[in-house]
Structures are given as C-alpha cells and as structure tokens.
A protein has these predicted regions:
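Active-site neighborhood of thiol-dependent amide/isopeptide-bond enzymes
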Residues: 118-171
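N-terminal accessory/pre-domain segments preceding catalytic cores
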Residues: 1-133, 138
Length: 171
C-alpha cells in the first residue's frame, strides 16, 4: 500500500530512486524490515531516512533502531493535539530525522518523549515549543569544549554542552 508520508508524487519518486541507489550501494543486508510490521507511512518514512542519511548510519545501526524512531515520530504526531497541524515538509525534514550533527545516536527520542509528553500535551503548539525550550534550559547549560559532539543523553547527564550539543539536545 502507498503511504501518505510524501504526498507529492514527483518528490516521492525522486526519494524512491535515491533510496534504491543507497540500498544498491550498501546491500540489502543493511535494510531489513522483516518482522517490523511497518505501516505504509512508517515504511515510506524509513525509506526517506535511508535515502538521505549518512552511509555510516546505515551500516552502524540496525534497521529496527530507525524504525523505532520513525514510530515515535508518528506516535507524537498522533498523540499531541497539534500534531496533525505540523506541515508535511516540516514533519518529514525536522521531526522524523534522528541525526542533527555528528553525535552518537542513542535512545534520547524515547526518553525525552516520555519525559515531555505530559508536560506539553494540553498546550497549544506555540506554547509547547516554548515549554520544550524551557525544559532544554532546565537540563543543559552552555559550556565550550573541543571534544566530539556529545549525544543527547550524554548532554543530559552532564547538564552542559556547546551550542552544537545544545541544538542536538533540543532537536
């Protein structure tokens, strides 16, 4: 079944071609959706990620990791009263993707969603954005460093981060 994650047929075709090229490059071993029971939209979103994510992410993390994160994106959109109002393009390019910088990928999306959902579920989209910004400020303060960008959970644990780490944490 055709999903509605990408409603523009021309863009969907371009993405599908890019996805097919990526899988041809890395091999089907690195894209295994068997037993994941994806919906059509989840499958299309996962293909979108694979079409454009860094090749190292494809080979370093199992398909199930990205599928779980895709599901969380759709879960948040469904459970938040304003989720349906997030424009398709913004949802596709700024909610579904996991990577922000060169940070290690972790389970931060699940951890943060569980911590934030009750805090924002009764707010307008505008107020939810502000509340999440306040939450980020409560958890992490700016501190310069020369090290590799820390993962969102590492930034949470240390409660400090550079501007890139703060943006990675916020997203």
């Amino acid at each position: 079944a055709q999903g509605t994650f990408i409603s523009n047929a021309a863009y969907r075709t371009t993405m599908q071609q890019q996805f097919n090229e990526r899988i041809k490059t890395v091999g089907k071993t690195f894209y295994n959706t068997r037993n994941l029971n994806l919906t059509a939209d989840e499958n299309q979103a996962l293909e979108f990620l694979y079409a454009y994510m860094p090749l190292a992410d494809i080979t370093d993390y199992p398909t199930s990791f990205f599928a779980d994160n895709v599901r969380l994106s759709f879960q948040a959109r469904k459970e938040m009263p304003w989720g349906k109002d997030v424009p398709e393009l913004l949802f596709r390019h700024f909610v579904v993707p996991i990577r922000v910088n060169n940070e290690a990928l972790d389970s931060s999306r699940s951890v943060f969603y569980n911590e934030l959902k009750n805090r924002v579920k009764h707010l307008s989209m505008h107020d939810a954005i502000l509340e999440i910004n306040h939450w980020c400020h409560e958890k992490v303060t700016y501190q310069p460093s020369d090290a590799r960008t820390s993962s969102p959970l590492q930034t949470l644990r240390t409660a400090t981060g550079r501007c890139g780490e703060e943006s990675t944490f916020a997203v």
